[in-house]
Amino acid sequence: MTRVINLDGESLTLEDVIAIARQGVACRIDDSAVEAVNASRKIVDDIVSEKRVVYGVTTGFGSLCNVSISPEDTVQLQENLIRTHASGFGDPLPEDAVRAIMLIRINSLVKGYSGIRLSTIEKLLELLNKGVHPYIPEKGSLGASGDLAPLAHMVLPMLGLGKAYYKGELLSGQEALDKAGIDKISLAAKEGLALINGTTVLTAIGALATYDAIQLLKLSDLAGALSLEVHNGITSPFEENLHTIRPQSGQLATARNIRNLLEGSQNTTVATQSRVQDPYTLRCMPQIHGASKDSIAYVKSKVDIEINSVTDNPIICKDGHVISGGNFHGEPMAQPFDFLGIAISEIGNVSERRVERLVNSQLSKLPSFLVKYPGLNSGFMITQYACASLASENKVLAHPASVDSIPSCENQEDFVSMGTTAARKAFEILKNSRRIVATEIMAACQALDLKSENHELGKGTKVAYDLFRKEVNFIEHDKHIEIYDELNKASTVIEDPSFLEAVEQAVELSIQF
């Protein structure tokens, strides 16, 4: 039976977002939402017919909120809004981000506080389910008043305007609709505002980054465990007794993950008089990785709330009361997404330092740069350079976006969140850090193969090593390889969900204790 996810505005999960955005799972409006949507719409129709003054319905927008709009112009007002607010810039957002945006906007609208027609929500849903993906430039949002510019680009194809992708081809909005067998619509009063006023874009991008960060946290524990085995690391820093007296959840989870991954390993040791402690990047993995786990768990809790929230303005209450407020303001997510970027950056930072320990012959006691006959061969020399470059770039990107604000709209919107920038930066940091972790895993596997005594790996690390070696080659000499290709293979392996799933079938991994 084909899976379909019901959207009721209350129960959408991060896993649902991933299923719809990346796996193409279909969704539908839950029957329980229909009555509230229709009731909300009737209130808007009454406002127009009674010529009541309500922001964005019978007035202009932003600093033009005191300009009255006649009932006969309320429809044109909404189309004008979309045409002029679609002023983004830059490369188009990727397909999974666009699908997540469409999904989260639908889920917010079906709560019944936005005064939009059910048929208009269903039109956006039809585009999503039939794979018509609006062309949305990545830049141009202040994160307050919501994500106006990118969401206006989302709406354009619904009107037969703008551009959209359909089956991998970029088309005009009207042509995409025609090929998908979808009729365009005209907007009614308030509908343009309802579709574009909200934190949907920043939330969608941040939600995808959060999900990927959770997977990266587990991969970083795996990478660290493999590096520990290369160095015959001391296992006492991961004993449960040490961490129960400082019961930080992420720290406890990391220590347990490392213990699980290394169970049965013959490549670890205990402290001796000649070697009392390992360096921080190995010994303090529970404290370093764990701090990022706690940060990202907090961010996920905020995402879970936001994907089921109303971020429109004004809000149409069930009793007919209309409230002009500030739920569109992205600050509640801008700060968490800045935090997300910092947390992921630290994972990349510590992984790069472990890469250095692997390629440095004085630290690893292996051939320089993990290759036979160093000098003639450079091996992994420049992979560490690349990791250092990415780690340093992350440090720049990790500067918080939310501490900045530029007033807009004739100073009516005088303090903005920059939350969309925060989310986009977090995703870039994620991509950089994932490449660093992939490099660490590749270097650790190379180092294990170079060890003169190759003992049994741990229960979890052996599964990972065996899977990795099916795709990524041992580098014997520089002459016969292009290391860039092998690095790309390494990235592809760890990004494939089946890799981590296989490890987790062997051992339990978690981000919270």
Curated annotation (Swiss-Prot):
Keyword Lipoprotein: no
One BP term from GO: L-histidine catabolic process to glutamate and formamide
2,3-didehydroalanine (Ser) carried by residues: S145
UniProt cross-references to InterPro entries, sorted A to Z: Aromatic_Lyase (IPR001106), Fumarase/histidase_N (IPR024083), HutH (IPR005921), L-Aspartase-like (IPR008948), Phe/His_NH3-lyase_AS (IPR022313)
Reaction(s) catalysed by this chain's protein: L-histidine = trans-urocanate + NH4(+)
SUPFAM superfamilies assigned to the protein according to its UniProt record, in alphabetical order: L-aspartase-like
EC number of the protein: 4.3.1.3
Pathway: Amino-acid degradation; L-histidine degradation into L-glutamate; N-formimidoyl-L-glutamate from L-histidine: step 1/3
Maturation and modification: Contains an active site 4-methylidene-imidazol-5-one (MIO), which is formed autocatalytically by cyclization and dehydration of residues Ala-Ser-Gly.
Sequence similarity: Belongs to the PAL/histidase family.
Name the record gives this protein: Histidine ammonia-lyase
Source organism of the structure: Streptococcus pyogenes serotype M49 (strain NZ131)
